[in-house]
Swiss-Prot record:
Belongs to the 4-toluene sulfonate uptake permease (TSUP) (TC 2.A.102) family. Pfam families: TauE (PF01925). InterPro entries: TM_pro_TauE-like (IPR002781), TSUP/Inactive_protease-like (IPR051598). It is a multi-pass membrane protein. Keywords: Cell membrane, Membrane, Transmembrane, Transmembrane helix, Transport. It comes from Bacillus subtilis (strain 168). The keyword Zinc does not apply. It comes from the Bacteria. GO terms for cellular component: plasma membrane. It is found in: Cell membrane. This is Probable membrane transporter protein YdhB.
Length: 245
């Protein structure tokens, strides 16, 4: 019951900033509840397949998704994530703590770049062979990162969609939500085959975070933008710090 309560409180924060928060889930599961890091990674990533559905549907209705690009990136991300999950079993638990923390710090830096530095670029034709090739590369790279370290890689995907595929910020955010679904499914299957998904824990995490996110989303439009942007940046940074303890 305590796990559900903690995940509910975390869900409020994640709903407020509009993030999947896999890194924070991993940090809390390992630090507070002493869940083995491999199980925390697998359970967290598998859970994202469910939590991303509602967000992707909402963005689809708002016209924020480049469907063809999203399906290509997502399809190859699923493959990369599956093999990334397999790779995790060869990484010692102590080392995995530090590697995942490092990825979260890098994620925070990329978020900082996206929110405060990166400028909007005009969108170009998305139907060239070169575009599809870059989409495949982005999908595989993001998938391997997510599968190996159990995080959603949303900042990596968003930055990649903007820089490599010239998507607008709005379309990069929406398309990322679509990409994360097959990515999480592929990684989740990989972790399941390695025995790193705790189904009871998965249900507790989902119940807590999804209920909390519903509440937290109601506060998003009530806060000043500077508070929201700061929270989006600080969330993975704090999660990375927690993993170091």
């Amino acid at each position: 019951m305590l796990i559900i309560l903690v995940m509910f409180l975390l869900g409020i924060i994640l709903g407020f900033i509009g993030a999947g928060g896999a890194g924070f889930v991993i940090a809390l599961l390992t630090l507070l509840f002493h869940i083995p890091i491999h199980t925390a990674l697998g359970t967290s990533l598998a859970g994202m397949a469910f939590t991303s559905l509602s967000g992707a549907y909402s963005h689809y209705r708002e016209g924020n998704i480049q469907m063809k690009i999203g399906l290509i990136v997502g399809g190859f991300a699923a493959v990369g994530s599956f093999f990334g999950a397999k790779l995790t079993s060869f990484i010692p638990a102590d080392l995995l703590h530090y590697l995942t923390a490092g990825m979260l710090f890098l994620s925070a830096i990329l978020i900082l770049i996206r929110l405060f530095i990166l400028k909007e670029k005009a969108q170009v034709n998305q139907s060239t062979l070169s575009t599809y090739t870059r989409a495949v590369i982005l999908g595989i790279a993001a998938g391997v990162l997510s599968g190996t370290f159990g995080i959603g890689s949303a900042p990596f995907i968003q930055i990649g969609l903007m820089i490599m595929l010239n998507l607008s910020i709005r379309h990069s955010v929406g398309t990322t939500m679509l990409v994360i679904i097959p990515l999480a499914v592929g990684g989740g299957i990989g972790y399941i085959t390695e025995g790193f998904v705790d189904y009871v824990l998965l249900v507790k995490v989902l119940v807590g975070t999804m209920c909390g996110a519903y509440v937290g989303a109601k506060f998003t439009n009530l806060m000043p933008k500077v508070v929201l942007k700061s929270a989006i940046f600080l969330t993975p940074a704090i999660a990375g710090l927690l993993l170091l303890f």
